[in-house]
């Protein structure tokens, strides 16, 4: 990097921060935080615990957004002033230090962009994730289990907690179906970018001839809904089946039919839960899963109608990403257009940067 490249980078980053400031309005956030502080000091604030919880979540979200904005604004100002000073004094050592720190400065601005992008109504919620292998038998089942592990590792890296809701093991390898709840700040905001079809190209370990295979798995992500959000489900529109739950490898088969499957006829959505020994609890969780899926479906319809020229790129039916392991190694996201060669790292859950690239690319459209 040289002086010209760094000065151009500063211009680009200043434009970004300026645009973000015009959207988030830092002064308005400060005003709102003062209002919340006054509310919290009111003796009657905790009389309505539910409302107090909602305001508490809002405070956390906008405090983090303001903090990220101030960090980015100050870091950019400091770098700009130091650059002007070092340039005027021809201080080569300081200039080189600024050039070396340029990626860190870009990361600070990206952090601000992401906190702005994750300020949507549902972004802060927990996420319900389901993975379904496509046609292709054992190979597709194995691909679904690789994706499942990738998300578990991602959650581990981010400090998210995972609760398995349903797990159906494949006959030879992998899995037939899995649903799990991801708990943590902005879990849905990040994982919503994973909605869609994931394609794998590799030499199959299950093919004795060592041929190249292409497999598909669909990933469906919906926000865990608060109890106060009403989703109407008519009794005539669903079928509820009860069956015996089983653990991995057919272990721990329940003697009672505690597992629950709900089929929603109008949409074809099927949800299953065998997480608990209690049929009643599994049924309640399955209904929660169904409501979340129906809510997500409605959100997608609204996005599609709002964008008449092109359907939403976050959708269950879109092929969103290709993972090529043979004849070369590359993961390419169809929405951001970014390609990554660190395939092993990605399959080990290092997907945050890739997801953030998608969120930024979709916002830019």
Swiss-Prot record:
This protein's record includes keyword Protein biosynthesis: yes
Keyword Iron: no
Cysteines paired by S-S bonds: none
Main localization of the protein described in the UniProt heading: cytoplasm
PROSITE patterns: RF_PROK_I (PS00745)
InterPro entries: PCRF, Pep_chain_release_fac_I, Pep_chain_release_fac_I_sf, PrfB
Annotated localization: Cytoplasm
Post-translational modification: Methylated by PrmC. Methylation increases the termination efficiency of RF2.
Cellular component terms (Gene Ontology): cytoplasm
Chain positions with N5-methylglutamine modification: 251
UniProt KW keywords: Cytoplasm, Methylation, Protein biosynthesis
Domain of life: Bacteria
Coiled-coil residues: none
GO molecular function: translation release factor activity, codon specific
Family: Belongs to the prokaryotic/mitochondrial release factor family.
Role noted for this protein: Peptide chain release factor 2 directs the termination of translation in response to the peptide chain termination codons UGA and UAA.
Protein name: Peptide chain release factor 2
GN (gene name): prfB
């Amino acid at each position: 990097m040289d002086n010209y490249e760094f000065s151009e980078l500063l211009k680009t980053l200043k434009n970004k921060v300026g645009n973000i400031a015009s959207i988030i309005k830092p002064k308005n956030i400060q005003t709102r935080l003062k209002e919340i502080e006054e509310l919290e000091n009111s003796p009657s604030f905790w009389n309505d615990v539910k409302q107090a919880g909602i305001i508490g979540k809002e405070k956390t979200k906008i405090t983090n957004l303001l903090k990220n904005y101030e960090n980015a604004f100050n870091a950019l100002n400091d770098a700009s002033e130091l650059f002007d000073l070092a340039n005027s004094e021809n201080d080569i050592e300081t200039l080189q230090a600024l050039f070396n720190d340029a990626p860190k400065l870009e990361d600070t601005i990206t952090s601000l962009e992401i906190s702005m992008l994750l300020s949507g109504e549902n972004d802060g919620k927990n996420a319900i994730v389901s993975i379904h292998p496509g046609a292709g038998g054992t190979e597709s089942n194995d691909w679904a289990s690789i994706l499942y592990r990738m998300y578990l590792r991602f959650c581990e890296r981010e400090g998210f907690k995972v609760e398995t809701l349903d797990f159906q093991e494949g006959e030879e390898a992998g899995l037939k179906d899995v649903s799990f709840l991801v708990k943590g700040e902005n879990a849905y905001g990040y994982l919503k970018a994973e909605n869609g079809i994931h394609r794998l190209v590799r030499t199959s370990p299950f093919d004795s001839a060592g041929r190249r295979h292409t497999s598909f798995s669909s990933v469906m992500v919906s926000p865990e809904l608060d109890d106060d959000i009403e989703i109407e489900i008519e009794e005539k529109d669903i079928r509820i089946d009860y069956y015996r739950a089983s653990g991995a490898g057919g272990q721990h088969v329940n003697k009672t039919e505690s597992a629950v499957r709900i089929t929603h006829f109008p949409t074809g959505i099927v949800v299953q839960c065998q997480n608990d020994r209690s049929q009643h609890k599994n049924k309640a969780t399955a209904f929660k899963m169904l409501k979340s899926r129906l809510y997500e479906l409605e959100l997608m319809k609204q996005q599609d109608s709002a964008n008449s020229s092109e359907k939403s790129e976050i959708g269950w039916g879109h092929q969103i990403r290709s993972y090529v392991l043979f004849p070369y190694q590359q993961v390419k996201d169809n929405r951001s257009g970014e390609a990554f060669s660190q395939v092993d790292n990605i399959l080990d859950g290092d997907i945050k940067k890739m997801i953030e690239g998608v969120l930024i690319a979709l916002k830019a459209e």
